Amino acid sequence: MNSNMKQKKKYWIISIFFGMMFTVLSCTGVEKSLQANETQVENKLARMASTTGQLDSPMVKSLAYQVIVNNDTLDVWQETCYDLAENGGQTDVHTALFTYVPGTQVKIICSSSFSNFTLSPKRLDIPVTKNGNELTFTIPEYYNYALAIPGRAPLLLFGSPDYSAYKQGAVVFAKGIHHGVNGVFKLESNKTYYLEEGAILRGKVLIENVSNVKLIGRGYIDDRTAPVAGNFVKVYRSQHVELRGFGVRHAALGWQVDMVNSSNVDVSHLNLLSFGQNNDGLDLGSGCQDVHFSHCFIGSGDDGFGWHATNAAADGETPLLNCHAHDCMIWKNQVGVGIRIGSSLETSSVEQLTFKDIDIAKMAWGGHSVAIPHSDWADVKNITFEGIRDETSGNTRFVLMYIKQNANSNPVYRPGTISDIRFIDCVSSATAAIFEGYDADHMIKDVTFKNVKVGGRNMLQSDIVANSFTSNITVVN
C-alpha cells in the first residue's frame, strides 16, 4: 500500500540512549501512537531474545508441532512476528525449513487432539492421512505449505533446493548474529553472499547501484530485537541480482522487499513474515524490468504483491515492464489486498506483467484478490492473472479496477488508462468485480475473464459492475 510510503512522507526518528530511553522527533499524532506501540513490541522482543539462546532472536523451539521429513526430524520454531497495534502488536506462527527432493514425505505430529484442519495450497488437493494427532502426506514439486488448525497458531513449512554449492568463493555469514555498519548491509558488485542456516543479519540490506550480486542461503534478515522503520531489503538501480532461500523478518512499518529501477532480478524461495501496517511483501517500482519471483511465501500485513510507481520526480518514468511472479503463497493480515498494481502509477507505462499460480491462503479482512487502483497517468496494459486462487471463505471482493484521483495521486493529477487485462483459471469465493473508468479518453477496456469461478460457480457476465467509461469487459466459460 502506498499511502504511508511515498518519499514525500516523513519517517519519525528514534534515538536510543543506553538501550532504554527513546526520544521521538518530528512525529505526527498518528506516528506517535504507532511508535509507542513499536517501542513496547521492541522491548518485549528484546526480552524474549535474551532467553531463546539458540538464535538470539524471537524464536523458541515449538512445543505445538513436530515435523518429520523423509525420516529427518526438523527444527520447528515458534516465531513472534510484528503485527498491527489492534492485534496487540505481535502474532505467533510456527515454522520449519526443509530441503525439497522429489517425493518428499512429511509427517506432522500435533501436541494435542484436533478434528478439522486445512492444508494449503488447496489447489494441489494433496491426500492427507490423519491418525490421531498425526498427519502424513507426500508433497508434489511445490515448496511452501501452510497447516491451519482452528484456534491454533499456524504451522508454515518453507522448502527450497540445496544451496550449498553457492558457498564456495562466497562471502559467508556463518550461523549467529551479524550487524551491519550503522544498521545496514551494503552489498557490492560481483560478489556472492551466502547465509548459512541460523545466520541472522541484524539490519537492513541495501543493494544499490551495483550489478552481479547474489544473496543466497537459509539464514534470516531480521530486525525483531532492534526494529527500525523503513523499507527493509532494498534493490535500487541495480542489475543482475539473485535473492534466494532466506527469511525476511521486519518488525516495524515498511515494505519487506522493495525494488526500483532494477533489472534482471531473480527472486526465489524467500519466506517473509511481517504483519503490520504497510508491511507489503514483494514490491516493485518504476523502471523495474525483467524481475521474476517464484516459490516465495509472503506473510504480509498489507499487500502481498504491491507493484507501483510512487515518485516520478525522484525515480523517473522508465516503464515497469516484463515482470513475473509464479507459484507463490500469500498469507495476509487485515490491510491491503492480495495483488495490487497501483495505486500510485507515476510512470509512462506498466505492461507485460504476469501472475501465475498465486495462492492467497489467508486474507483476514476479506480484501480484493486483485486490485488495480490507478491514481496517476501510466498506461497500464497487457497484464495476465492466471491461476489466482483466493482460499478465503466468505470473501465478497474479487476484482477492483478504477481510474481516479485519490490521496495517493500526484498533486498535479493526470489520469491514465487500463487495457488488455486477462483473468484465466482463477477461483474466489467472492463475486464482486468492479470497474470505474475516468472519462471517454481514459477508459478501462478489453478485460477478459476466462474459465473463472466465483462463489462456487462459473463467473457470469452479470457479475461485472462497470460505469460508462469502460468497454469490452467480457466473461468466457
Residue ranges of predicted features:
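N-terminal secretory signal peptides that target proteins for export/translocation
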Residues: M1-K10
